């Protein structure tokens, strides 16, 4: 509890990244404790093991007084909880006074279309656009197939009119998503003369007002490069590496308009607060359940297939570490044959997700490539154009199999005509699992349901149980 004799705070704005909290040392220590969090899994990290780092992240610096602008609601909550009087400098809160109907009319005026057909703007999309434009900063939770790209498109078109001499930067985690965002904008009806793409092999400088780039292409660039941008939009924000995301967004010191988009947060407070601090407060526009109930998304069935391994094998694996257990599973020929038979017997298009390329993905592909159906292999080394071609071909197929790494196909890739998803490798990432399921939730003219096959393994022996 804050000492009542030290209960005043002056909040000023340093730039579009940081606020400054002017407090005495006692209150500063309370703030430090309040905004300090344990990093999940820190004990496994080299810096922690070497005792160079204590495994905590501190979002408030008592030394500088700085804290991310997006954490203002949490600062107010701290003050309210601890009876701290605060003075907020004028201009820090400057919500734009917008009317919902005006936002709806603006979005309608863009006349967005897909494959030549007019797109209807859903109410929750209008709400998301309104919230973002009013607040200037936001973190929009928008699940798969909720029309997130259209929300981003409307924001980009609005800021393109508003920011006469500034550009708009859209950051995505993969080259495939650069191409997908670009093609979506063109599909909606915009000209390519407005949009520039950046990833390996593309120029980083352009006169075009909108730049779509992977964060990997930009995070090492100097602060001066980012001076031209007045708006930053981060798509699939949950996948940005914390240090790289922080690196880019803290260089955008004069970038007022900041919007992050994600379908999933990882459930940890640290993850959420970093994203909210760099972008803005969380706003959930619609739930996956709502979209399924209204038939916007496909009906979902999850089938957990538990493979009981022979006791003599279980005895060999008993006491193994997680990585050793994974090595055993991906190298297990009986298990791999079962996965291949399962995929061959499924009707419709099937996505098989794996974790280890050489040890597992390549093995599964080699076992399936002679099936009497089209089988594709996608991993990190597959170039962007090939991935796009595979995606396009699969949309027209009825019985294709894509053997793909989690990293390339678990997030953001749109394949409407996907009937089955098979998890051939275990994954400990909550985000990865949820995003992977999202790949199959889009509907198409040939599909209104999706089945997810989660392959689990029972290697228990005596009182010992395995990880997976």
Model-based region annotation:
Residues 230, 238-303:
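Post-DEXD/H (motif II) to motif III coupling segment of the RecA-like Helicase ATP-binding lobe
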């Amino acid at each position: 509890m804050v000492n009542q004799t030290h209960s005043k705070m002056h909040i000023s704005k340093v730039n579009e990244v940081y606020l400054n909290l002017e407090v005495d040392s006692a209150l500063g220590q309370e703030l430090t404790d309040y905004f300090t969090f344990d990093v999940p899994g820190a004990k496994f990290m080299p810096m922690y093991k070497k005792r160079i780092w204590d495994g905590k992240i501190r979002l408030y610096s008592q030394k500088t007084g700085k804290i991310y602008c997006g954490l203002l609601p949490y600062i107010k909550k701290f003050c309210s909880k601890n009876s701290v009087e605060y003075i907020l400098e004028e201009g820090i809160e400057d919500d734009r006074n917008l009317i919902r109907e005006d936002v709806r009319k603006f979005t309608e005026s863009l006349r967005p279309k897909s494959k030549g057909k007019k797109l209807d703007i859903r109410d929750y999309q209008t709400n998301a656009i309104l919230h973002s434009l009013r607040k200037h900063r936001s973190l929009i939770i928008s699940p798969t197939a909720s029309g997130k790209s259209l929300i981003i498109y409307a924001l980009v078109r609005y800021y393109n009119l508003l920011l006469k001499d500034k550009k708009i930067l859209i950051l995505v985690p993969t080259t495939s998503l650069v191409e997908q965002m670009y093609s979506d904008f063109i599909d909606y009806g915009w000209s390519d003369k407005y949009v520039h793409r950046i990833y390996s092999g593309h120029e980083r400088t352009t006169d075009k007002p909108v730049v779509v780039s992977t964060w990997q292409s930009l995070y090492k660039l100097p602060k001066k490069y980012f001076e031209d941008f007045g708006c930053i939009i981060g798509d699939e924000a949950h996948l940005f590496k914390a240090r790289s995301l922080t690196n880019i967004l803290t260089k955008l010191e004069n970038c007022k308009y900041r919007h992050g988009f994600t379908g999933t947060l990882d459930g940890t407070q640290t993850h959420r607060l970093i994203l909210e601090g760099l972008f803005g407060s969380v706003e959930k526009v619609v739930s996956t359940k709502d979209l399924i109930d209204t038939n916007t998304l496909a009906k979902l069935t999850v089938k957990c297939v538990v493979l009981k391994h022979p006791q003599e094998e279980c005895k060999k694996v008993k006491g193994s570490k997680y990585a050793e257990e994974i090595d055993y599973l991906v190298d297990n020929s009986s298990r791999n044959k079962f996965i291949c038979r399962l995929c061959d017997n499924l009707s419709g298009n099937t996505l098989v997700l794996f974790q280890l390329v050489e040890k597992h993905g390549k093995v599964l592909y080699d076992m399936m490539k002679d099936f009497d159906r089209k089988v594709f292999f996608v991993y990190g080394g597959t170039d962007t154009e090939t991935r796009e071609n595979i995606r396009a071909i699969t949309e027209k197929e009825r019985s294709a199999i894509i053997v793909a790494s989690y990293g390339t196909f678990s997030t953001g890739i749109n394949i409407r005509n996907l009937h089955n998803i098979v998890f051939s490798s275990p994954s400990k990432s909550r985000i990865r699992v949820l995003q992977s399921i999202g790949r199959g939730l889009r509907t198409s003219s040939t599909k209104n349901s999706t089945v997810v096959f989660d392959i689990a393994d029972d290697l228990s022996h005596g009182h010992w149980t395995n990880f997976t």
